[in-house]
Amino acid sequence: MSNQDPAARRSTLRTEALRVADDVLFPAAAGVDRTGVVPSSHWRALADAGLYGIAAPVEAGGPGLEFGEVTEILEVLVSGCLSTAFTWLQHHGVVISLSRTPNRSLRDELLEPTVTGRLRAGVAYAGVVPSPPRMTATRTDDGWVFTGHAPFVSGWGTVDLLQISARDTETDDVIAAILPTAELPTAELPTAVRASPVELTAAAATSTVSLQVDGLPVPDARVVSRVSIDEFFTNQNVGVRLNGTLPFGLVRRCTALLDVAGRAPAARRLRERADEARMALDSAMDDATALSAARADAARLALEAVAALVAARGGEALLRGSDAERLFREASFILVAASRPELKDLLVRRFAGEPDSR
């Protein structure tokens, strides 16, 4: 695929994403939900289709997609299988970090294998979001020591690399490092990383754990970035938009199933509303407050789309393992997963019928 001209390569990636979502992921989604396991064939299908490197620039071996092309592919994959896509989505943040890092040796070591999907990556940055932070970094002579808690880390046991972020105890800067998961000290040692499985009601196959980190040594050679806390939160707007693809992926699947159920007018209107919500989200990229509001609108739309599907399917939607039943649980996951406190507060106010705070 890399030998194609750029326009053809972009078109091929979109076509491949649709094929993987509809022919590989969605037919297996009920089984993934039932067993709590994403089959290894899903990861191979994504890698073979070139979908691990969609966020990489051309100079890093990527396709050089426009941002809207990246988000469309993310939506498409979410419409196939939420557990697979949510785990895979985390990978792109690591690819972006590696493509921008001043740490040339780390980039040379890891960028190419992450772009191709030969190495799969996850992230643990939620520990730096609250104040005081849950995850801290203390400077040593040749690196850092990370200590703290990361409450939700997906892909445990399936990813090869983990980008973990912590806040410097002296400057409050955010330090991000990429560590091979196979080398993390997980035994009961003074410098252990302990993983406790988190039992989720939806997307359980994401293999999500809670990490307790006690004195983890992080050499400078593994540090991918160091930014101020203000710069970190500014950069989070991109992450909010990428995670904003989750509700649109759910709407895509619900509308397709509404078409099958003979409810084409309802499906058409939901697609129109999704287009409007997507435009609002894209136009708010430079305004964190407006971005949260648009993300809340998208999450609410996903819930309404799956409610329409449940109503259309009737009693069948009450059967454990039906598409509508699974998607309804996944809508609750999408309401709160990968979201900031202000988004949750906004959703509470909107569902309660309270006015937005000014």
Which ranges hold each PLM region?
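Actinobacteria-biased recognition of intrinsically disordered, low-complexity terminal regions
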Residues: 1-19, 353-358
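Glycine-rich flavin
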Residues: 37-48, 52-154, 158
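Short, structured patches in soluble enzyme cores that scaffold and shape functional sites
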Residues: 125-127, 139, 150, 165-168, ...
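A short core secondary-structure module
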Residues: 152-193
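Flexible, small-/acidic-enriched active-site or ligand-binding loops
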Residues: 186-217, 228-231
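A glycine-rich, basic-preceded beta-loop-alpha segment at the flavin cofactor/substrate interface
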Residues: 212-242, 255-265, 278, 282
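Extended amphipathic alpha-helical segments enriched in small hydrophobics
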Residues: 242-304
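Glycine-rich phosphate/cofactor-binding loops in nucleotide/flavin-utilizing enzymes
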Residues: 316-358
